[in-house]
Curated annotation (Swiss-Prot):
Positions with biased composition (Basic and acidic residues): 1-19
Molecular function GO labels: DNA binding
Source organism of the structure: Dictyostelium discoideum
Region of interest (Disordered), ranges: 1-30, 91-110
Name of the protein described by the UniProt record: UPF0746 protein DDB_G0280787
Protein origin, superkingdom: Eukaryota
Positions of the SAP domain: 44-78
Length: 936
């Protein structure tokens, strides 16, 4: 049997690239194993595991794993091959048809065109004069150093970059079209990250995916990434990342028929994948169903489950609610579902399910009468919350767009009732389809009762508490919703406040719920409600003394002042509760909790009564502390400042916190207007540095703006690096540098207001700063210079002080992958490699190897192509060191590790290049090629 199979397989290598292979033919055509023959043999049990392995190897596929896994790989290969052949045949036919049409069309006569310029701005003429003057051009553009940040290869398609760069799609498009040697997309992981990121269903995204598929397909590129080589894997990835747009365009671009998709679904997609239902999963499910590409095993039911709060969120737009309803109803035939349950009796029908089904069926009939075109665009794009806040129980007026749907005079339906029906239908859908034991997980959200049940607030509270039966009842959501609902009468809100303070709800309240209620009152920012609440509280403090620890209204106002969101509330407290509140006391510290947007108005109120705010160091500070400190420094008439010696240490944490929050200008403003009495220690750089997000770059530019390479050289010279007497502290040596501030580095509004006279406030000297000192480790010094595009300065320091910078305790850490990997472009990495080649010694050989590892892991194929093209470099860099070849630098294991790094990062084009060039043994070559197969 194996020998016969062997004959079939031996013909595969010579035939599996032919375009005329017919996967639907029976048997073996001219000795060629077809998909139909392969599947027939497997299904009949005549193909054993060993034969499957032989077939997989012959097709260039991995042969490891269980029998079913090997079979899936082979079937995936045949499916991709079928799609690829169809695509090639279609393109060939289209080209022939186009050629025939061109031959039939008369050739147009040649015309001469004259290029003229109209309405050219005068300044443009000057631009072209400068642009065409080579001397001026070179002088101007010599100041632009974009080698580091302009290089595509520095970017890569990792998720951090894609998420943090607003124009990442445009950059990828530009890179694909440029077709240069430095490609952003280097491996399948990058493609997967793109599929995970770009999901918007618009023309721009569709066009992007068509460009992507065109660039990376077998008909247009020699890249190792070819979508049509792994049709099954990419369909799996797109469904896994829930990307409808990519999947839709992928199927259309490669003209994948429904039978292929069904087979892929059976092989790779678990039948329950759509069970954990989401809005976007339903879209894919219904799409596959509409193109007849869902196998019978992949029905939405009986696996369905969901987080109902997301479907019914009142923050969703109205049009999303409508689509959610339609997708759920379209996804399954409920009547058929009920009949199946009755006949098969596999799932016992709960009596209430039949009742739910009848109700749902009635609502569906009613909603079918409503067309989406009846709603205005404003309504469809408004959130449910906003629509409900503008609807009324009546439907007699059409003057306000949000009150009623667009309709005839005889069909003026209330929008609130329509929304309620959509909500109710979605709830009923899940009640009909889930087991009664799990019904509690599909309970209507609290906001449903608050918006759609017409009863008093008091009765509403009793209803929802009983409905939740004490389990996870959200008092905060209830109180805030009631107090902020503009459709609820003020008297009912006053009654709620009275009932809470009179302990009417004490049986259902926990102690903490009272604090939640207080917070809800203050967060309403409704002056009438707050005033009513405070007056009752002043009249009966003893009644709630045991319930709350804050019966004093002054403390309550202070503790919840962070919730104030408008000037009118501040004015209300100032005019009515100034004496009771601590908010306007002299030397108070409560001001630190007031929102920054209101702080200027608060300063005005304090200044008007001649009182000052106190700012001293406390162990606690929020993310806006440095901004508040900057205000305090600039307004000495409103603030009194005093810090002890601990602030120097705490300030390092403040700098770290503000960098992580992208508030580097706050740090710069502070250092421009206050002098620390000790050098700023930048040890936090070690943990905060994040090259992907571009954080710290503004701050680093500020620090090193006026620090020359010569001044750095002077500081480095004083470090004692004698090997015979260095100790631990010397190994960890730091250098102290001085940043000189000039008009160009401190041109901020804050500096214009900076106090002219210096003032000592403990560990700080307040006043405009001319310079300040900071300490930094040598390793982070190199990282900062690298980020500032000052690699030329690093190489200058290499030449001047090799005994310092090439000390293993500093430089080896700098060249380690975790430190330099994320910031290394191929341009600068190649500069380092070439420098080390020209200055070889025991240390630089290690650094050279580290840089080669980074280049391999990042997929910098061009660096290795340049090395290979140089006979001299390639002989001792990419050839194995042996007894007969001592000129080579690296042994077989080290070179093997370089290749493995490229394989592990899915840079297979580079992997194959290195495997073919390096003189590995046949055994090692085969081993590395198998690693590639297993990684695909």
């Amino acid at each position: 049997m194996i020998s016969n199979k062997r004959k079939e397989i031996d013909t595969i290598d010579g035939h599996h690239e032919k375009d005329n292979d017919d996967d639907d033919s029976d048997g073996i055509d001219n000795g060629l194993l077809t998909y139909k023959k392969f599947k027939k043999d497997f299904d009949s049990g005549s193909t054993n595991y060993r034969e499957l392995q032989i077939i997989a190897k012959s097709l260039g596929l991995a042969s490891n794993g269980k029998k079913q896994l090997v079979y899936n790989r082979i079937e995936g290969y045949f499916l991709s091959k079928k799609v690829k052949n169809n695509l090639t045949n279609n393109e060939t036919n289209q080209q022939e048809e186009k050629k025939e049409e061109e031959q039939q069309q008369p050739q147009p006569q040649e015309k001469q065109y004259i290029l003229t310029f109209k309405d050219v701005e005068p300044v443009e003429n000057y631009f072209w004069k400068v642009f065409r003057n080579i001397v001026i051009f070179k002088h101007i553009f010599s100041n632009f150093k974009n080698k580091q940040y302009g290089y595509y290869d520095l970017i890569g398609c990792d998720r951090s970059y894609l998420n943090d760069t607003s124009n990442s799609m445009e950059i990828i498009i530009d890179n694909i079209k440029s077709n240069n040697n430095h490609q952003i997309i280097r491996n399948k992981i990058n493609i997967a990250n793109i599929i995970h990121k770009f999901k918007k269903n618009d023309e721009k995204t569709k066009s992007f995916y068509n460009l992507l598929f065109s660039r990376y397909s077998s008909t247009s590129t020699s890249s190792t990434i070819q979508f049509d080589e792994n049709i099954d894997k990419w369909i799996q990835a797109m469904i896994g990342h829930v990307n409808f747009t990519a999947l839709d365009q992928f199927i259309k671009f490669f003209k994948i028929d429904s039978e292929v998709i069904k087979k892929v679904m059976k092989i790779h997609i678990d039948p329950s994948v759509f069970g954990n239902t989401t809005y976007d999963k339903l879209k894919i499910y219904n799409y596959l169903k509409s193109i007849n590409s869902l196998p019978t095993s992949h029905t939405l039911l009986p696996f369905i489950s969901t987080d109902l709060s997301k479907f019914l969120s009142f923050d969703n737009k109205f049009k999303k609610l409508i689509k959610s309803y339609k997708r759920l109803i379209e996804s399954t035939n409920l009547q058929e579902r009920m009949e199946q349950q009755k006949q098969k009796e596999k799932i016992k029908i709960h009596p209430s399910n039949i009742k739910y089904y009848e109700k749902l069926n009635q609502i569906i009939l009613e909603l079918n009468e409503i067309q989406t075109s009846q709603f205005t665009n404003d309504q469809l794009n408004s959130t449910i919350k906003n629509l409900l806040n503008h609807t009324t129980p009546t439907s007699t007026s059409t003057s306000t767009p949000n009150l009623t749907i667009t309709s005839t005079a005889s069909n003026n339906i209330n929008l609130k009732e329509i929304i309620k029906k959509y909500y109710k239908s979605i709830c009923l859908f899940f009640y009909c389809t889930v087991n009664s034991a799990t019904e509690m997980f599909f309970r209507k959200p609290l906001l449903y009762y608050l918006n759609f049940k017409k009863e008093s607030v008091d009765k509403m509270y009793e209803r929802v508490v009983n409905k939740w039966n004490g389990r996870s009842f959200d008092h905060q959501l209830f109180f805030q919703s009631i107090l902020k609902d503009i459709n609820i009468e003020k008297n009912e809100k006053f009654e709620l406040i009275s009932n809470v303070l009179d302990n009417k709800y004490v049986k259902t309240f926990k102690e903490y719920d009272h604090y939640i209620f207080f917070k809800a009152v203050f967060s309403s920012n409704d002056i009438e409600l707050i005033d009513y609440f405070l007056k009752i509280l002043m009249q009966q403090p003893n009644k709630i003394q045991k319930i709350t620890r804050y019966p004093n209204i002054g403390k309550l106002i202070g503790n919840y002042c962070n919730l104030i969101d408008k000037k009118e509330i501040l004015d209300f407290y100032f005019q009515n509760y100034r004496d009771e509140s601590l908010l306007f006391d002299d030397q108070n510290e409560i001001w630190k909790q007031i929102q920054l947007e209101l702080i200027e108005h608060y300063e005005y109120l304090m200044d008007s009564i001649g009182k000052r705010c106190k700012l001293d160091f406390t162990p606690w500070f929020d993310q806006n502390f440095l901004d508040r400190l900057n205000r305090a420094i600039l307004k000495p008439s409103v603030y009194s400042i005093g810090f002890d010696g601990y602030f120097d240490i705490v300030f390092e944490g403040l700098v770290d916190l503000n960098i992580k929050d992208n508030k580097e200008n706050s740090i710069i403003n502070f250092l421009s207007n206050a002098q620390l009495k000790h050098p700023l220690d930048l040890k936090f750089f070690e943990s905060s540095f994040n090259p992907y997000k571009g954080k710290m770059l503004t701050f680093i530019k500020f620090l090193f703006n006026n620090i020359s390479k010569e001044s750095i050289e002077t500081k480095l010279k004083v470090i004692n690096l004698k090997t015979d007497n260095k100790n631990f502290e010397e190994i960890k040596s730091k250098i102290e540098l001085t940043t000189t501030l000039t008009a160009t580095t401190t041109t901020t509004t804050a500096n214009l207001l900076s106090p002219k006279k210096s003032k000592d406030v403990g560990c700080l000297t307040i006043g405009k700063t001319e310079s300040f000192n900071f300490t930094i480790s040598i390793r982070m010094l190199l990282v900062c210079l690298y980020n500032l595009d000052r690699v030329d300065d690093i190489i200058y320091l290499f030449d001047k002080l090799p005994e310092v910078l090439f000390n293993p305790d500093y430089f080896s850490i700098f060249t380690n992958e975790y430190c330099i990997y994320g910031i290394s472009s191929s341009y600068y990495l190649e500069l380092f490699i070439n420098y080390f080649i020209e200055n070889l010694n025991n240390n630089t050989i290690n650094y050279l190897y580290n840089c080669l590892c980074i280049a391999s892991k990042k997929g910098y194929t061009q660096i290795f192509k340049n090395i290979i093209s140089s006979d001299q470099n390639s002989k001792y860099l990419l050839k194995i060191q042996t007894k007969s070849n001592q000129s080579s630098l690296f042994d077989s294991k080290l070179l093997n590790d370089i290749v493995v790094k490229s394989i592990n990062s899915s840079n297979f084009e580079l992997s194959n290049l290195l495997i073919d060039f390096i003189d590995f043994s046949a055994k090692d070559k085969n081993s590395l090629k198998m690693k590639i197969l297993k990684s695909k």
